[in-house]
Amino acid sequence: MEGITVPKSAPKEETAASKITKRTQEYGDWRGVTLARLRQLILDADPEMEEEWKWVKPTNPGVPVWSHDGGVCTGEVYKAVVKLTFAKGASLPDPAKLFNSSLDGNVRRAIDIHEGQAVDEAAFTALVLEAIALNSASKSKSSKTAKS
């Protein structure tokens, strides 16, 4: 079969979910375990949650993003903290006072988790569900406005 070129199949693109799994496994310490646990809580809270991988650039390998009718939160890992930033956190009720970072902004709020710090899983799940409800209400409102 001389002279015949067999096309190579395109490499399979890595999914956002596999990138997030890989990211949690890259850290061989509490940070990876913490991000993996919070991810599981997010996914358990909403079976329709979408996982995305955004903001890849030469200085940043990308950021895990969880979305449902819009961004719910991002998960970032730093040297001393795992940070979950809620896109519309300033509009969410937080009776358990989980938000402890980015408190001065008008839109976002974040939860910084340090080594050894426990997370109130029920309160965290409630925040995720509130964020989804806010996104869904905003989407519904904008759909009605567009139809008018």
Please report, for each region that a protein language model flagged, where it lies by residue:
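Charge-dense, helix-prone N-terminal extensions
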Residues: 1-148
